[in-house]
Amino acid sequence: MPELPEVEVTRLGIAPHLEGRKVSAVKIIDGRLRWPVPANLTKTLPGQTVNGIERRGKYLLLEMDTGYLLIHLGMTGTLRVLPSSDPLKTHDRVTLEFGKLSLRLHDPRKFGAVLWHPKSKGPIKKFILLQKLGVEPFSSEFSGELGAEILYQTSRKRSVAVKQFLLAGQAVVGVGNIYCSESLFEAGIHPAKAAGKLTRPQCSRLAKAVRSILKKAIEAGGSSLKDFVNSDGDPGHFMVQTKVYDRKGLPCKVCKTPISQMVQGQRTTYFCSQCQKR
């Protein structure tokens, strides 16, 4: 599933091509995604300009003249900017036309989303799917020891494992399964440790690790396990840098202990039992 780094890589790839351009047409090839694609987009969007492209968590937010187009890549979605003359591919679901350019959502499993939030309904932060998201890891709110304090305060009295606490995204957004395992390893925290038992020093190390790992992942173009490619069609390369993820039985890159694997909440977790003592 594309997580924050993959979505940010996508944003960085499409923004230079689309910002300032006017939509000439919208084609809904198959609108049966996680939620139905609003049919009226074919009438609402043409003539509107893309004034900016932001990211909130795993959502891309295209600011148009009268509202925001929200795009979620789901499990296997990708966005690419292509010449409008290129033929559609199987699993292309929605296209936004910009004259000779086309933005295409390719989503084989149809778990993605294309939604619309009119500005007349208030700021985009009031959109129901964005209301409960935690802070952005690269925002000023999460910088320095502010991030540590957010993790410490939101984890109090929480018996859930720290990995699942991070995955929930209510403290800080974007720390998906791969990046949870890597961040917890870098911080030296066992993934099954109860979130409520995290100390302030541990929260400080974890906040720093989250920012560091996500930054490295973005610089590497994200992670490509099966389907993810960037807006140019290239895979991400973060997987070659992982220290624990998908390395079961291989020696830890720090202490040489074989990497362990367990399942938490139906998600596979990787860790070093020596570097991350419970």
UniProtKB/Swiss-Prot annotation:
InterPro entries on file: DNA_glyclase/AP_lyase_DNA-bd, DNA_glyclase_Znf_dom_DNA_BS, Formamido-pyr_DNA_Glyclase, FPG_cat, MutM-like_N-ter, Ribosomal_uS13-like_H2TH, Znf_DNA_glyclase/AP_lyase, Znf_FPG/IleRS
ZnF (FPG-type) ranges: 243-277
CDD domains from the UniProt entry: EcFpg-like_N
Keywords per UniProt: DNA damage, DNA repair, DNA-binding, Glycosidase, Hydrolase, Lyase, Metal-binding, Multifunctional enzyme, Zinc, Zinc-finger
Molecular function GO terms recorded: 8-oxo-7,8-dihydroguanine DNA N-glycosylase activity; class I DNA-(apurinic or apyrimidinic site) endonuclease activity; damaged DNA binding; zinc ion binding
Biological processes annotated in GO: base-excision repair
E.C. code: 3.2.2.23, 4.2.99.18
Binding site for DNA: H91, R109, R158
Catalytic reaction annotation: Hydrolysis of DNA containing ring-opened 7-methylguanine residues, releasing 2,6-diamino-4-hydroxy-5-(N-methyl)formamidopyrimidine; 2'-deoxyribonucleotide-(2'-deoxyribose 5'-phosphate)-2'-deoxyribonucleotide-DNA = a 3'-end 2'-deoxyribonucleotide-(2,3-dehydro-2,3-deoxyribose 5'-phosphate)-DNA + a 5'-end 5'-phospho-2'-deoxyribonucleoside-DNA + H(+)
Record-linked Pfam families: Fapy_DNA_glyco, H2TH, zf-FPG_IleRS
Catalytic residues (positions): P2 (schiff-base intermediate with dna), E3 (proton donor), K58 (proton donor), R267 (proton donor)
Binding note for cofactor: Binds 1 zinc ion per subunit.
SMART domains: Fapy_DNA_glyco (SM00898), H2TH (SM01232)
Swiss-Prot/TrEMBL cofactor(s): Zn(2+)
Subunit structure: Monomer.
Classification via PANTHER family: FORMAMIDOPYRIMIDINE-DNA GLYCOSYLASE
Function: Involved in base excision repair of DNA damaged by oxidation or by mutagenic agents. Acts as a DNA glycosylase that recognizes and removes damaged bases. Has a preference for oxidized purines, such as 7,8-dihydro-8-oxoguanine (8-oxoG). Has AP (apurinic/apyrimidinic) lyase activity and introduces nicks in the DNA strand. Cleaves the DNA backbone by beta-delta elimination to generate a single-strand break at the site of the removed base with both 3'- and 5'-phosphates.
Family as reported in the entry's similarity comment: Belongs to the FPG family.
Name of the molecule in the record: Formamidopyrimidine-DNA glycosylase
Organism per entry: Polynucleobacter necessarius subsp. necessarius (strain STIR1)
